[in-house]
């Protein structure tokens, strides 16, 4: 469960970072 949650959080952070980079 922890690994799954971590994966989701990592993906969310990665998406956020990508959004900032695109900006």
From Swiss-Prot:
This is COP9 signalosome complex subunit 8. It is found in: Cytoplasm; Nucleus. Component of the COP9 signalosome complex (CSN), a complex involved in various cellular and developmental processes such as photomorphogenesis and auxin and jasmonate responses. The CSN complex is an essential regulator of the ubiquitin (Ubl) conjugation pathway by mediating the deneddylation of the cullin subunits of SCF-type E3 ligase complexes, leading to decrease the Ubl ligase activity of SCF. It is involved in repression of photomorphogenesis in darkness by regulating the activity of COP1-containing Ubl ligase complexes. Component of the CSN complex, probably composed of CSN1, CSN2, CSN3, CSN4, CSN5 (CSN5A or CSN5B), CSN6 (CSN6A or CSN6B), CSN7 and CSN8. Keywords: Cytoplasm, Developmental protein, Nucleus, Phytochrome signaling pathway, Signalosome. Belongs to the CSN8 family. It comes from Brassica oleracea (Wild cabbage). One of its GO terms (cellular component) is cytoplasm. Its main location: cytoplasm. One of its GO terms (biological process) is red, far-red light phototransduction. The keyword Cytoplasm applies. The gene is CSN8.
């Amino acid at each position: 469960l922890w690994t799954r949650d971590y994966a989701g959080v990592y993906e969310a952070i990665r998406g956020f970072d990508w959004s900032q980079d695109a900006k």
